[in-house]
Regions:
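Conserved class I S-adenosyl-L-methionine
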Residues: 4, 8-63, 77-78, 100, ...
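Glycine-centered, small-residue-biased loops immediately flanking beta-strands
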Residues: 66, 160
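Class I SAM-dependent methyltransferase SAM/SAH-binding core
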Residues: 69-122
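A short SAM/SAH-binding and catalytic strip from SAM-dependent methyltransferases
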Residues: 132-144
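A short glycine-rich, Lys/Arg-flanked "PGG" loop and its adjoining helix->strand segment in the class I
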Residues: 146-158
Length: 230
């Protein structure tokens, strides 16, 4: 798989992306939050997010030889769920989360999984490098979720799958207000609770094949798209 170093400045979200949430964050803030969460992330978030992870991998339908990029691999909690007949690359911005992932992958002997540290907003891969690009529980954790999807699309091969599993602002007026009110608090445990799904899809120019609520309670959405062939 070809790699290249992209010369980029630290990414700052544009005004359109900022309009998707009441909260604007920077990379250093995100890295600091997740470096602190690394030791307790699996304990706090593992059980409640696990059902969604299982549904996502079932829906993705990985076939032998698939090249999979997991954007936001975190502690590697997904790693053992991937079949050993695919080739998985996991990236994350947090060095502490990646260290947990390296320990887990080494302990389980997952030779089909490799890990790299990088910014999801500036992926250091050549165009069309992967068959599946999957971002679980990530896009409401980054400064510019739209730029993340642009990068996901760029590195996905034509006809490949772009998959997002995430919490988005509730469509109920009451719960939508609650999501917006909570977002300044939830950002300190790693995510913005008020990311707007219709606005996000429009700005990212994603035309989903399917959008499915997953987990109980159904607070998370699985969005599956494909990259155009032309």
């Amino acid at each position: 798989m070809a790699l290249f170093e992209r010369e980029t400045d630290e990414f700052r979200p544009d005004l359109a992306s900022q309009a998707l949430s009441v909260i604007a964050i920077e990379n250093d803030f995100v890295a600091n939050v997740y470096d602190k969460l690394a030791s307790v992330y699996d304990l706090i978030f593992g059980p409640i997010l696990h059902p969604g992870r299982l549904v996502a991998l079932e829906r993705i339908g990985i076939v032998p030889g698939d090249r999979v990029l997991e954007v936001g691999v975190g502690t590697g909690i997904n790693a053992s769920l991937y079949p050993d007949y695919c080739h998985v690359t996991g990236i994350d911005f947090s060095s502490s989360m990646l260290e947990k992932a390296r320990v887990r992958i080494g302990r389980k002997g997952l030779s089909h999984v490799r890990l790299m540290q990088m910014d999801a907003q500036a992926l250091k891969f050549a165009d069309d490098s992967f068959d599946i690009v999957y971002a679980p529980y990530l896009v409401n954790c980054v400064p510019d979720p739209v730029q993340v999807v642009r990068e996901m699309r760029r590195v996905c091969r034509p006809g490949g799958k772009i998959v997002i599993l995430n919490h988005f602002r509730n469509t109920s007026p009451l719960l939508s207000r609650l999501d917006r009110a909570l977002s300044p608090l939830t950002v300190h445990i790693g995510f913005k609770s008020d990311l707007d799904l219709p606005g996000f899809l429009a700005q990212a120019e994603l035309r989903p094949l399917s959008i499915e609520k997953v987990s109980v309670p159904p607070l998370w959405s699985l969005v599956i798209s494909t990259k155009d062939l032309h």
